[in-house]
Amino acid sequence: MIFDALKSKAASLKSDSRVRKLVLACRKLLSEKGEASGASLARETLAFYAELDSDQRVRFFKILALDFSPDPARVLASATAYAQKPSAENLAVLTHVAEPPRQELLRRFNRAPGGTQAIVSMRERLLDALRKDAQLSQVDADFRHLLSSWFNPGFLRLVRVDWNAPAALLEKLIKHEAVHEIRGWNDLHRRLEQDRRCFAFFHPVMPEEPLIFVEVALVKDMAAEIGPLLDVDAAPANPRDCNTAVFYSISNCQPGLRGISLGNFLIKQVVDQLMQEFPRLKRFCTLSPVPGFRDWLKEKAARGFEPQYRIPSEVFAALAQVEAKLGDTLGAGVAELRLQEKRISALRDELLCLVSAYLTGVGEPDGLSGDPVARFHLHNGAKLDRLNWGADAFDKGLRQSLGLMVNYVYEPRRIEYNHEQFVRGVTVASKDVTGRLS
């Protein structure tokens, strides 16, 4: 037991020494004046960081939060000076002292070869730690501030990925596909055929790493179910005969860039590119999952709506029917859901009413849907256009939304208006959706 205690103590001291070594290197890096020596020191500092385990990384992030923040006394003095004399010089001083030193530390990390990728990976670990320690949010704010500038869409390159792309890149598409799993090379090949398009954003300093990619199907009408779009045996259509582009999957490849606005710019640039390549395209829409619907439905069936919100009587009636006839199935696994298909189908109208309520934010404090996919597209300026019953028969679709999917429509001339409405708390939706709530 004594030996075990000594081993534990030694491991703890070694762990502390690694963090201390990294912090000392960070302080030295911040004080370094030379560019060449600074790049070398940045590389060495990032190498120290790479040696840390998960617990040590958390300790390092906490030190960044506590010891690499602005000096409150200097900030107050500079703010007072600026308030008394609001000159450009005093403003510059205030701006300088108010910036957390860790921001400059991150800039200096970026001098090292591969520094940008290292910072993106570092933020991925920070986001993991942030789930358990809200104090780290101030550190994340600095990461997010810098990454938002470094990954500004003006710096990004839009690339069409086709079957002739390097195998390593194609493997990354398979690995990072987040919406509809790519089931091998044949599946990927079909998604890159002549009537399909895949576009990705790349950053100049990470040329081998896709940041985000979107998959598009060129078809002759707005798609109502995902199965035909993913059918590997379906014959490719002539894209020149198609009038509709369906965005059916968008996937982030870099978890460390979560919350950095990339997807909205990607879709808009792809729309522009497709319009140039295929002038006959008249409609740009999505076929989107509703990932939060089943959880929302279970929660409302168990607890109901908050009394302070006005809920349409149709929604109350639909919820009562679903709770009475399907309550025991709402929490069931996929196998049981398939067995109960007839019971679920008998409540089609009620479930469509409820998904309309969910997607338009009925009963939500801000009047907007809590569904992440809905918020993304609606904030991006799309219109909530059509609900599709039985659109996703795959396990994931049944588990998340009882097979329901949605079409969001991007009308280039209406995008800004729709976005402004969403920001004001209004969801722009078709009568197919709103008509179910009255």
Task: Outline where the language-model segments fall.
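Extended, composition-driven regions rather than compact fold-specific motifs
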Residues: 1-260, 264-438
